[in-house]
Amino acid sequence: MIFDKNYITSALLPRIRGLWLSSQDTFPDFLSPVSLEEKRNNEAWVTAAMERLQRHMKAFPSRSRIAVRLPFSRKQPEQAAYSQSPAPQLQKWTQEMESLFHGLLFDEPILGICRAMSEDSLTAFQASMKDFLRQVRSFAPEMKPEDMGQALRNFMVYSIFREQNGLPQDCPSSIFGYSMLYPFTDNFLDDPKHTSEEKKHFNLLIHHKISGLPITLLSLHEEKTAQLLADIFAVYPSPESVASYGEASGKDIRQGLLLMLEAQEISQKQADASLFLTERNIMDISIYKGGLSVLIDRFFINLKMTEEEILFYFGFGFLLQLCDDLQDIGEDKGNGSRTLLSSCLTPKETAARVNRLFSYTAGLFDLCPCRNPAFRDFLLQNCHELILTSAAGSGSWFDEAYLKKLEE
């Protein structure tokens, strides 16, 4: 089983920890320089794209205008009823969002996704995202735009893995359920408005649902969370998962989700001021949570993995977790959450961590499956850009000289 806890904690986690600790913390000399003209053109494109995206997200129709689907289960559409006809404003908003996606995929000049993927692949990629958004709109019309974006990002990781492994795009109920779980669970647990007792009940409910035990639902939010888990279990095990992972594939994904729940619970310690955490404690929490999250994403594409591939995807999750933490330095410092980035005491120390992140990324991609070299290069460049933009978003925690060096 891939999600054997002893395997995760005794084999994968120590190797990723070792890769991180062995990575250099000096400024990377492998970043490609960008000419001043190209930089200005890129900045202008990014600024315009972000302004359009932000305006569009702010124009999200108010919840009072959005049709509420009853019941919300996507599994039995013939039983669904609507409290009113779908709001025209929401339909228009979704169409415009699809147009924005098209521009981002086909016109984006920086990362070169149009050079890494064929036109047919890009079209399929866009279609799968549209399908995902339609399912989100049907399942949770009340969802905030930022939470919708979070779920979409989770789904895009899965879609990228399918492209990386030469598989056609799709949007099965399992990956819909898993992509939506993060905004439904992690955000609930991070929200200080919920009491510790509410969070304990919520975690217990999830644990029981994954384990196949009876559950008591106290709210619509809990009911929808249970439905998302049911969407996953509805297709596991399947002939494809059994062929890829063996007869225990259904048990394996349940174990993976239980470990992910445990990782979310452990991560709450980062904000508990009464607990003493060493740098290694903080590091291991981030590796465990980030690594499991992405390894589960990869599991859902139903394609057998080598030991090296498992290690890459687990390490890739840690990379994405660190990018999140890099972007959230100010917020994490404000609420007392200790991460490898927020725990830095000086701008120099923070810069060294970012340098190490670049070096770690380079070392990790030596393990990257290489069925499509152009797509691998695109993915690596995307990671570099993610680190750069995350650092820029937390610019107040760096020296100006370091930020200027990154900009070059």
Residue spans for each PLM region:
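A short, conserved beta-to-alpha structural element at the edge of catalytic cores
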Residues: L213-L217, K348-D366
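Amphipathic alpha-helical protein-interaction segments
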Residues: L21-P28, E38, W45-S83, P172-M180, ...
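Accessory, usually C-terminal, subdomains that scaffold auxiliary metal cofactors
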Residues: L340-K348
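All-alpha helical catalytic cores of prenyl diphosphate-utilizing isoprenoid enzymes
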Residues: P109-L181, N187-F188, P192-G330, S390-A391, ...
